[in-house]
């Protein structure tokens, strides 16, 4: 479905979900976001567009433009797959921008795994990396959303 939708409309749909959660009484006033692959890129974009997010956890997602990093206020927990050269090529510049702008972040590169290591419906699934990344994610959410 996402391949047939206009990218701006698709991103606006994700952003509408964030805005819904910001008004949702059970959200306790704090909203965080996570996403995988394309959704990881959405998570990074949301961190720029919604500085009021409580936290952001992208899994192997395209990084936001380095020029936009100053807008990020949410603490970031970033998960990368060592063998994912396409996504990882943007990481050094993104990390430099995060450091230069004194952003709160932690980043993990999981050794020997590829893009999609958390997706248990594909051959790229790596249970130990997925479990560790998910434990870290839940801890991050507990820290920033509780």
Residue ranges of each PLM-predicted region?
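Short alpha-helix in the alpha/beta-hydrolase fold that links the catalytic acid
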Residues: 88-98
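Gly/Ser-rich "nucleophile elbow"/oxyanion-hole loop immediately N-terminal to the catalytic nucleophile
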Residues: 1-34, 144-145
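Short beta-strand/loop motif that positions the catalytic acidic residue
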Residues: 72, 77-80
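Gly/Ala-rich beta-loop-alpha elbow adjacent to hydrolase catalytic centers
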Residues: 35-39, 43
């Amino acid at each position: 479905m996402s391949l047939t939708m206009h990218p701006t409309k698709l991103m606006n749909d994700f952003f509408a979900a964030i805005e819904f959660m910001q008004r949702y009484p059970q959200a306790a006033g704090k909203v965080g976001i996570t996403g995988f692959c394309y959704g990881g890129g959405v998570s990074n974009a949301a961190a720029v567009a919604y500085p009021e997010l409580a936290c952001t956890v992208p899994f192997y997602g395209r990084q936001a433009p380095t020029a936009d990093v100053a807008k990020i206020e949410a603490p970031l927990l970033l998960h990368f797959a060592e063998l994912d050269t396409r996504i990882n090529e943007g990481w050094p510049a993104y990390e430099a921008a995060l450091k230069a702008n004194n952003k709160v972040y932690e980043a993990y590169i999981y050794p020997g795994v590829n893009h999609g290591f958390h997706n248990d419906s594909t051959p790229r699934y790596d249970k130990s990396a997925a479990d560790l990344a998910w434990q870290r994610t839940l801890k991050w959410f507990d820290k920033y959303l509780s």
